[in-house]
Design a protein with these regions (language model features):
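Transmembrane helix-loop-helix hairpins at the membrane interface
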Residues: 1-153
Length: 156
């Protein structure tokens, strides 16, 4: 949890904020921080053991989602909590045989090659559901013009 929390402070706290002082485009901010987040994770053994492309896609999608919810919510608490929950899940519940953190998991994935389709669609569905749940819970979107919430058009 400490490592994931520190990553969020670095990427969604300092880096995202620093880039926002230079560029006023939320899409660019989310894409750039997610890209840097992905490249940093290449130091882990997973991309080299299971496939660089699918691994980078998974990390990029996670980084993009975390950056997006940070930009919309205005704070990094959700991203930090989600990142910690994700890391606990992948290391304690469903682990990889050759992981950066070797811990006993309830289930162990023993494949030697992860495919794109096993990453993209499940991640897209998962992040879409979380986005809707968070949006409703925290009233991110204004579909009624009299409210002070942000409108979907202002995200771009």
């Amino acid at each position: 949890p400490i490592q994931a929390g520190l990553e969020e402070i670095i990427f969604r706290g300092y880096l995202l904020h620093a880039l926002s002082l230079l560029v006023n485009n939320r899409v660019f901010l989310a894409l750039s921080t997610a890209s840097i987040f992905s490249v940093v994770h290449l130091s882990n053994p997973e991309p080299w053991n299971y496939g660089i492309g699918p691994y980078l896609l998974a990390i990029f999608m996670m980084g993009f989602f975390l950056s997006t919810i940070t930009l919309i919510d205005g704070g990094m608490e959700l991203a930090m909590g989600l990142h910690i929950a994700n890391n606990l899940w992948v290391h304690l519940v469903v682990g990889l045989e050759n992981s950066v953190i070797n811990t006993p998991s309830l289930f162990l994935i023993t494949t030697s090659n992860i495919q794109y389709e096993s990453i993209f669609l499940p991640s897209l569905i998962q992040f879409s559901i979380m986005f809707v749940v968070f949006g409703l819970k925290y009233k991110w979107f204004n579909f009624n013009k009299s409210s002070k919430s942000i409108s979907p058009a202002s995200l771009i």
